[in-house]
Amino acid sequence: MPNKTGDKYGGLAKKLRSGRPVFNGKIQLDYDALEAPLSWRLPRIIFVNSMSDLFHESVPMSFIRRVFDVMNRCPQHTFQVLTKRPERALEVASKLEWAKNIWMGTSVETKEYYERIRLLQQIPAHVRFLSCEPLLGPLPRMPLKGIHWVIVGGESGPGSRPMQGTWVLQIKEQCEKKDVPFFFKQWGGVRKKEAGRELNGQTWDEMPGNQVEQAKNERASNRSKILV
């Protein structure tokens, strides 16, 4: 996710000395940008709200419906919707049309947010994902039933809180056991480019879809090699 406040969201967030944007309580709805995906012919993966939350309590249902209308009219694109408020997403889920190209996710930074996962599991999206970024603690015994993708990443920028490698490996092992695609985004830190995004000497870019079967086959192949 972007670490800085873009011009589009100017006035909606302020920065602390750590460099992290903090929501100032004002909601700005960009109606002009809603139909832009309709003009994009080639397929794209679109992260709907990099610095916002579609299911914030101040966002009117009429606006949410318009966003979903556009997403349903663009089957060529994949829309990733991330929220920290899955309780509202679940509350209005039955009023929305969930096309296969609409992926619904929630943020899980620590185990204290496991209730978000349980709420997400009840939302009728074809793909449900977890964003464990920034990962701020271990996530043991994650409830992964009905979860189709897990993203993990460390916090970046000045004042970023460190992420332990054991936390990342713990999540990866759980994903492997449940055949859930695992995507490792970054180690983060003040110099995130230098820290890179390799885990155990390689990058992990698994995603839902055809790559799920590919990942299963690769794991089965690796297990058979170990047995031999």
Question: Residue spans of the language-model regions?
Answer:
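Conserved Radical SAM active-site core
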Residues: 1-102, 111-114, 139-144
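Auxiliary Fe-S-binding modules of radical SAM enzymes
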Residues: 4-11, 136, 141-228
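Structural preference for beta-strand elements that scaffold enzyme active sites
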Residues: 45-47, 78-80, 101-105, 127-131, ...
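Active-site beta-loop-alpha junctions enriched in small/polar residues
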Residues: 51-53, 84-86, 107-111, 133-135, ...
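Alpha-helical scaffolding segments of alpha/beta enzyme cores, especially the outer helices
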Residues: 62, 66-69, 91, 119-122, ...
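Structural alpha-beta junctions
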Residues: 73-77, 125-127, 172-181
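Basic side chains
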Residues: 84-85, 116, 128, 172, ...
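Short loop-to-alpha-helix "cap/lid" segments that border enzyme active sites
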Residues: 94-96, 100-148, 162-169
